[in-house]
Amino acid sequence: MTNWLLLIVCLSIACQDVTSAIHQRKSSKNLEHSMNVIHEWKYIDYDFGSDEKRQAAIQSGEYDYTKNYPFDVDQWHNKTFLAVIRYDGVPSSLNVISEKIGNGGCLLQPYPDWSWANYKDCSGIVSAYKIAIDKFDRLWVLDSGLINNIQLMCSPKLLAFDLNTSKLLKQIEIPHNIAVNASTGMGGPVSLVVQAMDPMNTTVYIADDRGDALIIYQNSDDSFHRLTSKTFDNDLRYSELAVAGESFTVHDGIFGMALSPVTNNLYYSPLTSHSLYYVNMEPFMKSQYEENNIEYEGIQDIFNTQSSAKVMSKNGVLFFGLVNNSAIGCWNEHQPLQRQNMDMVAQNEKTLQMIISVKIIQNLAYSGRMNRIHKNEYMLALSNRMQKIVNNDFNFDEVNFRILGANVNNLIKNTRCAKSNNQNNNQNKYKNQAHLD
C-alpha cells in the first residue's frame, strides 16, 4: 500500500512538473509580441489622384469608408497587395499599398490600374476575394463576381497577371455547373491555393464555402472539376463564433486551405467546425478524379475553437488562425495529427482579432560567414475583425485592420512545431486519423 501511495505521489509531482514546463515555455515565448505590426488602418482609403476626385467619389457613393473590408494580403518584392471585397462604396477591390498616408492609414492604389476597378460591364474585377502569387511571378485572382457578398453581378472567374509587366495573362470564367451546388443553388468561392509545377502545368484549388465543394482548375487544358465531401460541410454545432468577447453567427463550409510542398496534402477546415481534414493531391495532379481515387482523412474536433486561414511552410509546418483565441496555431505534419502536437506561435487579443489571411513569403538573405545566399521564410497575417463586419458595429476612430509579420523560424522556435528527431519518421504521423467520405 505504501508503495502505491509513493507511486501516486511521484506521478502527481511529475505531472505538475510537465504542466509547469509547458506554462513556462509559453510565457517565455511572449506570444503577444511574436508578430510585428507592419501596416494598420482605422479605415481603408484610396489614392484617388486629387482631393477633388476623392470628394466626387464620396458624393456619388462610389466610395464609403465604412464599407471597405480587407480579406486577403500577399507580397511580391516591394509590392504588398490587399484585396478588399466589393460592397457598395468600394471603389477598387484589387489593390497595392502605396507609400502615401491618409487619416485612416496607408492609401491603396488599384492594381493594375483604375480601369480594372470598373466592373459594371464585367470587364474589370468585381470582387477579389482571394489572391495568390506563384513562383513564376504570376498573381492569381479569385473574383467571386459578388456585390455586397450576396448579389451576383458577374460570373465568378480566375485571372492571372504577370507581375513583371502587370499585364493580364489569362482570364477564365468558372462555369455555372462548377461554381454552384446543383442541389441547393448555392455557391461562393472564398479560398485559393495555387500549385505551379511549371508555367503550363499549374493547378488551382478553390474552396466553395456556400456550396460545400472543392473546385479544381487545370491551366494546361482550362478544365474545371467540382468535388464534394461531407468533410467540406459546415457543422451547425459551431456556427456561433466569438472574437474578443463579441459573438456572431455564420454557416460557412470549407474555408481556409493550405497545400504541403512536402506531402502534397491539402489541409482544410470548414469555418464552422473544430475539425482538420486533408486530401492528398497526387491523383488530381494526374487528372484522376474518380471517387475511388480520392481519400479524405482527418480528425474531427481536434481544435478547441474554429480555425480560419491556413498556410504551410516549406518544411511542412501548418499554421492556422484560431478564432476564439485571437491566435495563430501550428502543427508539424511530421508529427502525429493530435491536439497535443499542436501549439500556439502568436496570440494577441488586440491585434489578432480574426486572422482572415496568412501567407508565407520567401525572402532572400545573404550569409557572409557561409558566403552564400539562402531563403528565409517570412509570415504575413491579416486581421480584419470579422465580428465587427458581421455585426456592423465598427468604431472607425480606432485601429480595425492590421497586417503583421514575423520570421517563420522565430515563430516556431521552442514550440512543438520545431524540427524534431522524428522529422523524417512518417510511419505513424496520422495514427489517430479517420477515413471520411
From Swiss-Prot:
Subcellular location: Secreted
Protein's recorded name: Major royal jelly protein 6
Organism: Apis mellifera
Induction per the UniProt record: Unlike other major royal jelly proteins, not down-regulated by the ecdysteroid 20-hydroxyecdysone (ecdysterone or 20E).
Classification via Gene3D superfamilies: TolB, C-terminal domain
A GO cellular component entry from the record: extracellular region
UniProt-listed Pfam families: MRJP (PF03022)
PANTHER family linked to this entry: GH10609P-RELATED, PROTEIN YELLOW-RELATED
UniProt keyword Signal, yes or no: yes
Annotated glycan sites: 78, 164, 181, 201, 324
Family: Belongs to the major royal jelly protein family.
